[in-house]
Amino acid sequence: MLLEGVLLVVQALQLASALDLPAGSCAFEEDTCGFDSVFAFLPWILNEEGHYVYMDTSFARQGEKAVLLSSDLQAEEWNCLRLVYQITTPPGSVSDPSQLNLYVRFEDESFDRLLWSTKEPSDSWLIASLDLQNTSKKFKILIEGVLGQGNTASIALFEIKMTAGYCIECDFEENHLCGFVNRWNPNVNWFVGGGTAKNTHSVLPQDHTFRSEHGHYMYVDSVYVKHFQEVAQLISPVTTASMSGCLSFYYQLQQGNDNVFSVYTRDMAGLYEEIWKVDSPGNAAWNLAEVEFSAPYPMEVIFEVAFNGPKGGYVALDDISFSPVHCQNQTGLPFSAVETSCDFEIGLCNFYQDKEGPGWTRVRVKANMYRAGDHTTGTGHYLLANTKFTSQPGYIGRLYGPSLPGNMQYCVRFHYAIFGFLKMSDTLAVYIFEENHVVQEKIWSVLESPRGVWMQAEISFKKPMPTKVVFMSLCKSFWDCGLVALDDITIQLGNCRSPARLPPPPGECTFDQDECAFTQEKRNRSSWHRGRGETPTSYTGPKGDHTTGVGYYMYIEASHMVYGQKAHLLSQPLRGVPGKHCLTFFYHMYGAGTGLLSVYLKREEDSEESLLWRRRGEQSISWLRALVEYSCRRRHQIIFEATRGVSIRSDIAIDDVKLQAGPCAGMEDTTEQSSGYSEDLNEIEY
């Protein structure tokens, strides 16, 4: 049977009966298996003959929701959640189609995390495969249907199944084939082999799982090949959680010299990367292949066979598995993102400098009105080159990163700031060095940059040999030797530019795309504005955002307000939960007439808000980090209130808001604080 996408998932109708389904699963044969409709929304209706639940226009209007909530679940091991569903729309184009969303609700979080969302209509059942990371926390699965436009719109759920393991694993014994799909080609395609399937063109092997003619596997052969380089692709489900480890599978080749069997990854931007290729003709036995696999963001695994002609034989595939440890054939040290990151709050981490020469200097700056502090907190440590101790003409400062394994894609992110008014050519550059400190390549150098603004740089690279990332600062002469600062270095696997598949959780917002789930309360009040760069009024407000230096932040424009006027920015309603929560955000209060910035907790049905945190007056020219800890068992909202000060130099800004479960680390003791800057206005502590 041909595995073209839609035909494959139709076979999901033959999944195991409800009696065999594990916790968090349901086949909707007679009931909803512990999944309950949430009373605040429309109910999901169980079909009279069983088999599925649905919502449609017979009882719902456009925009109305139906929500299904599971009982408490636990997943101490990695799990795969598979959802068989169908969305129907009326014929023709629809501007507002129906939508199906799946959330995870952890017991200690006040918001739900979106795991998957689709508006894809179909005339048959489709299957979604979603990775659930192992956790010690209890959680619930929440499935939300939003009815779209059209008098025949509907959403139906046929089955939910949660099983231990990774979604990219498959032995091809179940009819849904783990969500793997064949990319249809008129001449060559992947087929299901074994069991009752027969093929008159090739003598195909027994499967690997059971070593039996009754077991199943996937295969592709060249019998219908008409042209050179006919290609067949078998595509895995998209990963939905970050993973790194060893991908293994079993394969057989016939006439291996006339075909090419390869494995690729493909991210959501469509970027392919080859991670494995067969290097021998093979034999009439199952061969084990192991390959290092890293998916720091959503991607697919593609098993591809290219035939050179009609005598290209066949390729068979079985028992795809994944382990979060490195392959047995892996040589050298494994990669660790923790070992390759540093905010310089406690020394240089795993970075080091040349032994000769003064090099980079680790410094900190107290909050003041003239010199920016570090990027991490505004008052912490960072590295500074070309200081009064190192600015001799011809000086070169090198900061070496830890060793990185070869043949892997890396993303380097760091923040830098330029100070002074001198020329900046080659003030900061990033090089790739081989293990023996031989220069490989310059991969980045600073261009013109705003002075005193922490800018984020991103660099993607891949080298076949082990390498080190080296940050180099050059002081050519007195007139070409500006101060350069470096902070918050991270090196991670993957491409920096891979697009995000899902929006950030409701508890996080950088304001770079929009205002997220925040809303304004404008009754008798002024407004928060979303802006970038400098604010319109001189000598107040930030020069750039905290996230990247060129992104967006929220601020009040004091020149549009009167003294004492307030602006409110409200979070979305948050669920009450036991335990503490930590609210982290960055604030900017610079200007001689700066007023107040306050954070309030607004409980549902309470007429008054509770003050959680406040700062009064001018604080610093830097973005400063705030940590706010609170508890609330009732439904509530967080309110950011900015109050205009005595003059137009009173712009106040916030950025990078994040809400997390648990207490804050390094919590400040004071709720309210007045002006917080240093009396030593321009002091650098070496």
Swiss-Prot record:
**Segments of this protein annotated with the region Disordered:** 665-686
Identify the stretch annotated as signal peptide in this record: 1-18
Any one GO CC term of the record:
membrane
Q: Does the keyword Glycoprotein apply?
A: yes
Record domain MAM: where: 24-169, 168-329, 340-498, 507-666
Q: Which InterPro entries match?
A: ConA-like_dom_sf, MAM_dom, MAM_domain-containing
Q: Which UniProt keywords apply?
A: Extracellular matrix, Glycoprotein, Repeat, Secreted, Signal
Is Ribonucleoprotein a UniProt keyword of this protein?
no
Q: Where in the cell is it found?
A: Secreted, Extracellular space, Extracellular matrix
Q: How is it modified after translation?
A: O-glycosylated; contains chondroitin sulfate.
Q: Which residues are glycosylated?
A: N134, N329, N524
Q: A single GO molecular function, which one?
A: glycosaminoglycan binding
**UniProt xrefs under Pfam families:** MAM (PF00629)
Q: What is this protein called?
A: MAM domain-containing protein 2
Q: Which organism is it from?
A: Mus musculus (Mouse)
Instruction: Give the gene name.
Output: Mamdc2
